[in-house]
C-alpha cells in the first residue's frame, strides 16, 4: 500500500467481513484516500489477497492485523478516518477510545444509530453505556443529513434495509403527501446481508430455491426506520437466493384531502432528490441488478386509485449504498472531500 502526501489515511477495524472487504475495494479506487491499516481478528496474519483474490492487484502484500489495544494504537496513529466493521457491542466499546484521536470515526454497526440509549435493550439486547457519545453521533445518510455530517467526529452508518426504506418514504412524509402511520415495508435482501460467517440459515442448500420472511414484527431495523422516516410502520424482511441487493416495496395511505397521482409522486421524488448524485428516480420498476456494485439507489412510486394506496419501491446494493458505499459517501462529506470520490452510480450489468 503506497501512500501519497496529502491523501487521507484510512484504517478499517474489522476489515475481514463483507462490509470490510467492500470498503477495501472502494478505497482502492479512491483518488484521495490511502488504506494504512486493516484489522480482522479472526483472520489476523492472513494475506488479504489469499482470502479475497479480487483485491490482489491493489493489495498484494497486505496482511490482516489484530486489534489488541497496543497494536491498534500504533495502527491508527495519524489516521484521518477509521471505519469500524465490528459487532455492535464491540463498536460501542471501541468508539469512545477513538473519537478525538482520529479525524473521523465511521461506525458500520448499529451501536450509535438510534437516538435513545434506552431503546437498545429491547431491540439489540444490550445496555448502551455511552449515552452522551450517542447524542453526538451524526446519522450517516448524506441525502437527509448532509449539513450535520460536515466535520463530524462520529458517524453512524445506516442499516441496509433502513437506507432502502428511508430513501423511498422519508421525502413523501416530509412533504406531507403520505400519512405517518400505517405504513408497511416489505423488503428482500441477498444472502451477503447475513455476513461472511457460515450459518445454517445462509448456506447454499438452505437458501437456494427458497424465499422466507424473518424477524417477524420485531426486526431490529424497525425503530431506526421509524426515527429516520418519521412514521410508525410495520417492517418485514425477506431472504432471497442472490448474493447482493435489496428491493423494498413500501405501502402507505395519502394524507386526507391530498390530490395524488402516480406522476405527482414521481415528480415530488425528483424534486426532493434534485442534484443528488446517487439517487435515480425511475418511471419503471427498479431492479437490484441495475445497482450491483454501485452506490446508487433506484426509486419509483405509484398511486393505486382502486385501493387508495401509495406504493414506493426502491432498489440498492446492500453492501455498497446499503453499507460500505454509504459509509464512504458519509466519510467524504465529513472530511470535506468530493462526495462522489471513490464511488459510482453505475451498476455492473449483466
Where are these regions (language model features)?
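Alpha-helical scaffold segments in soluble metabolic enzymes
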Residues: 22, 26, 167, 171, ...
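Contiguous C-terminal substrate-recognition/catalytic subdomains in enzyme active sites
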Residues: 202-294
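Short amphipathic alpha-helical segments
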Residues: 151, 246-248, 308-310
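N-terminal Rossmann-like NAD(P) cofactor-binding subdomain of oxidoreductases
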Residues: 2-207, 212-214, 302-305, 349-350
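Conserved active-site and cofactor/substrate-binding residues in soluble primary-metabolism enzymes
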Residues: 18, 136, 160-167, 216-224, ...
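Short glycine-rich or small-residue beta-strand-to-loop segments that form or flank ligand, phosphate
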Residues: 9-12, 156, 249-251, 312-315
Amino acid at each position: 500500500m503506497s501512500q501519497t502526501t496529502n491523501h487521507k489515511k484510512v484504517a478499517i477495524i474489522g476489515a475481514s467481513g463483507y462490509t470490510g472487504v467492500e470498503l477495501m475495494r472502494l478505497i482502492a479506487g479512491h483518488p484521495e484516500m490511502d488504506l494504512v491499516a486493516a484489522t480482522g481478528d479472526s483472520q489476523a496474519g492472513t494475506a488479504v489477497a489469499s482470502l479475497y483474490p479480487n483485491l490482489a492487484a491493489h493489495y498484494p502484500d497486505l496482511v490482516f492485523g489484530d486489534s489488541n489495544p497496543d497494536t491498534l494504537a500504533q495502527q491508527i496513529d495519524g489516521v484521518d478516518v477509521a471505519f469500524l466493521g465490528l459487532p455492535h457491542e464491540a463498536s460501542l466499546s471501541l468508539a469512545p477510545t477513538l473519537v478525538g484521536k482520529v479525524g473521523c470515526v465511521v461506525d458500520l454497526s448499529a451501536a450509535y444509530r438510534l437516538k435513545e440509549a434506552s431503546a437498545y435493550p429491547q431491540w439489540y439486547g444490550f445496555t448502551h453505556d455511552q449515552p452522551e457519545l450517542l447524542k453526538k453521533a451524526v446519522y450517516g445518510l448524506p441525502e437527509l443529513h448532509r449539513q450535520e455530517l460536515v466535520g463530524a467526529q462520529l458517524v453512524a452508518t445506516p442499516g441496509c434495509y433502513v437506507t432502502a426504506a428511508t430513501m423511498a418514504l422519508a421525502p413523501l412524509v416530509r412533504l406531507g403527501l403520505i400519512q405517518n402511520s400505517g405504513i408497511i415495508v416489505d423488503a428482500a435482501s441477498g444472502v451477503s446481508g447475513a455476513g461472511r460467517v457460515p450459518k445454517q440459515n445462509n448456506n447454499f442448500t438452505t437458501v437456494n430455491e427458497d424465499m422466507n420472511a424473518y424477524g417477524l414484527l420485531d426486526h431490529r431495523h424497525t425503530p431506526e426506520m421509524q426515527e429516520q422516516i418519521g412514521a410508525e410502520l410495520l417492517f418485514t424482511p425477506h431472504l432471497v437466493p442472490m448474493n447482493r441487493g435489496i428491493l423494498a416495496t413500501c405501502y402507505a395511505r395519502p394524507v386526507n384531502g391530498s390530490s395524488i397521482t402516480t406522476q405527482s409522486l414521481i415528480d415530488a421524488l425528483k424534486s426532493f432528490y434534485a442534484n443528488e448524485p446517487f439517487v435515480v428516480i425511475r418511471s419503471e420498476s427498479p431492479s437490484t441488478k441495475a445497482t450491483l456494485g454501485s452506490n446508487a439507489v433506484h426509486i419509483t412510486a405509484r398511486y393505486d386509485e382502486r385501493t387508495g394506496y401509495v406504493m414506493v419501491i426502491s432498489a440498492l446494493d446492500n453492501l455498497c449504498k446499503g453499507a460500505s458505499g454509504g459509509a464512504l459517501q458519509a466519510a467524504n462529506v465529513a472530511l470535506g472531500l468530493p462526495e462522489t470520490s471513490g464511488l459510482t452510480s453505475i451498476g455492473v450489468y449483466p
